[in-house]
Design a protein with these regions (language model features):
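Internal, hydrophobic cores of structured domains that mediate oligomerization or house catalytic pockets
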Residues: 1-32
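C-terminal structured domains
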Residues: 22-175
Length: 175
């Protein structure tokens, strides 16, 4: 997909290219004529992520041609708490110097749920639905780790950024 990055210098166009394999992204870089240095930086990010990520999104900006920064969004096959994918991936990022053990630990603590509190006053749509569904289907805020983006730019250290999600959901407590 495409996005207008109007708040960034030069107002570049962000291009996101999804792929189920690292090889597909390597081939993409070659097929669009990226120079060897940019392909090498992409390969470096893929080498970190490939063994554990389920699928990828390559992100780069276009202004008057491709901008130097390359981003690689890494998605896991399962949510944290339902396997070791995220724990292993974050350990790999720690080993690669892309995050600290404390940062990885904090990210692993994020997933979960927070049961909604019954408020006073006028009921919102969510509160009315919770009342209708009853105690076996309480509302909650569901938290998960969506993806981690690895970023590489010439002359800068590689970086990792985490993208968190918090959504309103309904729990099923029926026996």
């Amino acid at each position: 997909h495409l996005g207008a990055m109007s708040t960034r210098e030069g107002s570049p166009l962000r291009v996101n290219v999804g792929a189920a394999s690292a090889d597909a992204l390597r081939e993409f870089g070659e097929s669009v004529g990226w120079e060897a240095e940019r392909r090498a930086r992409l390969a470096d990010l893929l080498d970190v992520a490939e063994p554990l990520a389920h699928h990828f999104v390559l992100a780069f900006d276009l202004a008057e041609g491709p901008q130097p920064r390359v981003g690689l969004e890494c998605y896991m096959a399962s949510a944290p708490g339902y396997g070791d994918h995220w724990r292993l991936f974050l350990a790999r990022l720690t080993d690669a110097g892309l995050c600290s053990e404390a940062e990885a630990g904090a990210l692993l603590e994020w997933p979960g749920r927070t049961a909604g509190a019954k408020g006073r006053g006028r009921l919102t749509g969510h509160a009315r639905l919770a009342d209708f569904l009853g105690t076996r289907h309480p509302g909650a805020i569901l938290r998960t780790l969506n993806h981690v983006k690895l970023v590489s730019a010439p002359g800068e250290p590689r970086r990792a950024k985490a993208y968190l999600v918090a959504t309103r959901g309904w729990l099923d407590l029926t026996p």
